[in-house]
C-alpha cells in the first residue's frame, strides 16, 4: 500500500475497505509506515487517521464529507466483543448562531449522514491498541423511517437552539440524536442565542448519534 490517491468510484472505496478488514492496527500501520501509539490517551484521533490514510480520504475540512466527490462520509465505530457500539458517534457541530432558515434538508447533519461508510473496529480497552482488528465495512444510507427519526430529533433540538433555550438542552433529549458539549475543554466558547434573543457566549454543541441507533445499523447489516 503506497501512494494512496482518493478512490475514484464507490466500488473502489468499498474494495479498499474490504481489503483492510481483519488486519490488526499494527499490520495496517506497518503497511502505511505509521507508528502505533501505546494508547489513545494523547492520540484520540489516531484510529480515525489510520483508517482515513488507508482509504485515501480527502476532506481538507471537517465541514466536508470525507469522500465528498463520492458523497460518502467515513465513520469508525468502536465495538465490543458482541459487536455493540462502545460510544456515541459525532456527526457535526450544531449551528448555535446564524441559523435562521436552516431546515433539515439543508442541514449539516443530513448532509453528513446521507451516505456513510462505517468501519467497525475493536474498541475494548483490555485489547492492546496494536492488536485490535479492523472490521468488515458497512456502506449505509438511512431508510425513510431512519431519516424520519433523525429529522424529528434534529428539528426538536434545533427548536431549543433557535428559541434561545440552550440552558434547557440535556443529552437525554432525542431518541436517536443528542446534543452534547463538543470541545477539548470548557474554555472553548462560541456564540449562541440567549433566551431574550441576545448573543451570548456558550459551549460549542455537537450532534451525536446514540449507541442504540448505530447498533441498529450494524444489526441490520448482519441480518442481511
Curated annotation (Swiss-Prot):
It comes from the Bacteria. GO terms for cellular component: cytoplasm. It holds the Pfam family MutH. Its main location: cytoplasm. Keywords: Cytoplasm, DNA damage, DNA repair, Endonuclease, Hydrolase, Nuclease. It is found in: Cytoplasm. The keyword DNA repair applies. InterPro entries: DNA_mismatch_repair_MutH, DNA_rep_MutH/RE_typeII_Sau3AI, DNA_rep_MutH/T2_RE_sf, Restrct_endonuc-II-like. GO terms for molecular function: DNA binding; endonuclease activity. Belongs to the MutH family. Sequence-specific endonuclease that cleaves unmethylated GATC sequences. It is involved in DNA mismatch repair. This is DNA mismatch repair protein MutH. It comes from Histophilus somni (strain 129Pt) (Haemophilus somnus).
